[in-house]
């Protein structure tokens, strides 16, 4: 029997969202390279429209370089930098911002087209508007992050950097979740504990991504480059972990505490992922997804250790970030397996709204 014509719009929507997810993943990696190459403050202005074009003449390049020379990073870290060296860091930041503009256009224009055609159901339409709003917010958060390094600091705030990264990956996860739900299939029948552990794994993955961004922002991966010991012990002394006052500042500013937290949560994530895989295998429910997630977290932990031991060279740092995106994707998909997939075209009058349970086992 031929495919139902009403499903054709959803096929186009799925392709579109998959492209957007891929572009976001690329942008996150370019952002990681921008951070690792210390390029994020090379453009000291935020011009959403006119900033699309890079400098096109010697005079424009000189103006951009002179603007960079006014900030503390140049004066304290890069004094004596040549114009050729400046161009290298400029292109990283400019590429990162350009990708943001491309993603915005690639999301908005097809979205408006689908809205005009009436292809999107109410639930999907609302969700996509939320995703678009988060994307617009992300641009503002990016400038908020950059602004933190323009007056008194020689780098951006690690807290703002972590916020910027996690928001990008929250948007990415929302798109992946939506893609999975747009694939028409029933939810997997599974014990409640499997659903709960899948949800906890996803939540802890986001916390770990935040901690990883703090490590990157503080350059904390370039110190304490031993494993399994850190600062000469398996568990550092409380005096070293909590010396800043008030105590909670250590969670964000203390290099030792931030790296230690990142390590400890990695161990907890790995243990929970393995237990989840064993439980899923015994319950015969989403066992393949659980195993894939456990393997990915195992590989990510091993890669993180190697990256630490080599003091975060750019190649290993980017590989670690790419693997983190894969872990997040698998964690989202694993939780989504316990939620129903639905078709969301306006023509599917009989289809449940996005997020409404469907019956069946798969």
Swiss-Prot record:
Binding site for heme: 262, 320
Annotated InterPro entries: COX15/CtaA_fam, HemeA_Synthase_type2
EC code: 1.17.99.9
GO terms, biological process: heme A biosynthetic process
Transmembrane segments: 12-32, 102-122, 128-148, 159-179, 198-218, 264-281, 289-309, 312-332
Gene Ontology cellular component list: plasma membrane
A GO term for molecular function: metal ion binding
Subcellular location as annotated: Cell membrane
Lipid bilayer topology: Multi-pass membrane protein
Coiled-coil intervals: none
Catalytic activity of the protein: Fe(II)-heme o + 2 A + H2O = Fe(II)-heme a + 2 AH2
Pathway field: Porphyrin-containing compound metabolism; heme A biosynthesis; heme A from heme O: step 1/1
Principal EC category: oxidoreductase
Record keywords: Cell membrane, Heme biosynthesis, Iron, Membrane, Metal-binding, Oxidoreductase, Transmembrane, Transmembrane helix
Cofactor(s) the protein needs: heme b
Assembly notes: Interacts with CtaB.
Family statement: Belongs to the COX15/CtaA family. Type 2 subfamily.
Function: Catalyzes the conversion of heme O to heme A by two successive hydroxylations of the methyl group at C8. The first hydroxylation forms heme I, the second hydroxylation results in an unstable dihydroxymethyl group, which spontaneously dehydrates, resulting in the formyl group of heme A.
Protein name as it appears in the record: Heme A synthase
GN (gene name): ctaA
